[in-house]
Amino acid sequence: MQTVEFPYRSSSHLILLHVVAESGAWEKHGLDVNYDYKIGSEDAQAGINSGELAFCGGNHVSTYGLRARGSKWVYLGQTVNNVYHSLVVRPDSGINSVRDIRGKKLGGVGSHPILNNWLYLKQRGLDQDRGDYELVMQEEYKPGTMDPTEPEKKLPPLWHWVRDGKVDAAFVGMPSSLFAKAAGLKVIDVEPLPMIQFSSISTNLDFVERHPDLVERFMKGLLEGIAFFKTRPDKAIEIIQRRYTKAGQMTREQAALTHRSLDSVLEAKMFPTMKAIANVYQEALRHDPDDAARVNPMELWNVHHLRRLDDQGFIDGLYGNQRAAAHRHDGAVDQLNTE
């Protein structure tokens, strides 16, 4: 069994990764994937560049500037192309839609979700730089990086800040929105944001060229794990309820809703969408305006491994009589991303 490092940038990825691991898909391909630990943005960059890490499940924003500075970071696939979130407010807040955030305090946590909030609201006429609303962050970030200054600091769920009156509103996804609703807060459905987020398959181009067999086995295992998630819902829900407790202990019903929300946006074939890439690139330009502007965002995407597997019929074959495309719908997924 070959050990492979695949740390996450956000614990929300574990909703999927626990299921993939327990499905036995990676083991089937001779891989012992060490996925259940978090890594900072700068540590991920160093590990991928040195080859200490085979893969990383994230770093979505800072990598475009890195590419301009000589990094060989590449993305091999994308599990989710949209942020499906809800707006959580107090029942007496007077907030009934996104436009009502004007003049209010918006809570934020995680360097990438905060950028998502900025872009989402700007696309809807609310500009943070113009002072249309006040962003209140749960943590500070090292200048020029996506990493918090105190990475070990214990933070309360963001919806607690709404409940306790520290902020007027916050964007959250499942299962956080379920816990917020159960606590009596108002949960408002809003439009999704096309975005590269959740588990991206990140690695180094030199690693890919040196280890094509390992890359193929890893990708096959992940694709098979996604198929298990989609076609074995009862088992997947049981794993989610038992294993994913980072945001709180879910009931069976909450685990089922969380599964359904992720299943509905989980990409069976792991191809990125152009809208998602375009939006994350806008965030890269905000984060690193000079260097990111020197890069065509498509330079970082290398999906020929996926394309070959798809052309061979491997992915559709995982779904029997149903094509894999039939397993991509509309829904809601948490945006507990860090980057």
Please state what every model-predicted region is:
Residues 285-339:
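Conserved C-terminal helix/tail region of periplasmic/extracytoplasmic solute-binding proteins
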Residues 145-246:
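Pocket-lining segment of extracytoplasmic ligand-binding domains
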Residues 34, 42, 133-136, 255-263, ...:
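Short linear loop/turn motifs
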Residues 18, 64, 114, 118, ...:
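Predominant activation on well-ordered alpha-helical scaffold segments within soluble catalytic domains
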Residues 1-154, 158, 164, 168-174, ...:
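Short, glycine-/small- and polar/acidic-enriched structural segments
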